[in-house]
């Protein structure tokens, strides 16, 4: 039986090596997400609303997105029109078309950002009919979406990397450090 501290040291080293071996994925997949990120940034900077949702397994990530894009201490950042669509009363339950019509009347130029599986038909109708959208999906339901592997052992890590890329790109463009 191994000593606990030796086990931790070995685990950390193994994880570090594994992540290092997989770290090139962002470079390899750049063509699939760069246009989507640029389009989303342009949408937000032109006054559009970004309605964010996630499947039940990635609710933690939804909270992470919302708390990082609009932190409670807004001294350093402007307030962005980023809304928790999962918590919205407009989240489709029965009539997706009615929900979409209400959303479009309520939010200025809404765009949907969904992460994960699409867990109900009403949401699927809305997400797949609204163009443009910023979809990070596990199954290819739409041409312009970022396709991820649900059972990827590094999925959470990749989601965080993608978000950090998006967040840094958004604020770099917003503060005129980068042009679209």
From Swiss-Prot:
Per UniProt, what is the name of the gene that codes for the protein in this document?
hobA
Quote the annotated effect of residue 175 to E.
Does not interact with DnaA in vitro, mutant cannot be made in vivo
Misc remark: Estimated to be present at about 3000 molecules per cell A structural homolog of E.coli DiaA.
Annotated Ca(2+) 4 binding sites: 176
**Keyword Electron transport carried by entry:** no
Q: Per its Swiss-Prot or TrEMBL entry, what cofactor is needed?
A: Ca(2+)
Tell whether tRNA processing is among the UniProt keywords. no
Q: Which residues bind Ca(2+) 3?
A: 140, 143
**What inducers act on this gene?**
Expressed in logarithmic, stationary and cooccoid stages (at protein level).
Quaternary structure note: Forms dimers and homotetramers. Interacts with domains I and II (residues 1-112) of DnaA. In a crystal with domains I and II of DnaA HobA forms tetramers with DnaA fragments bound at the dimer interface of the tetramer.
Which species does this protein come from? Answer: Helicobacter pylori (strain ATCC 700392 / 26695)
Query: Could you say what a knockout of this gene produces?
Result: Essential, it cannot be deleted (shown in clinical strain N6). Depletion studies suggest it is required for the initiation of H.pylori chromosome replication (strain N6).
Gene3D superfamilies on file: DNA replication regulator HobA
Q: What is this protein called?
A: DNA replication regulator protein HobA
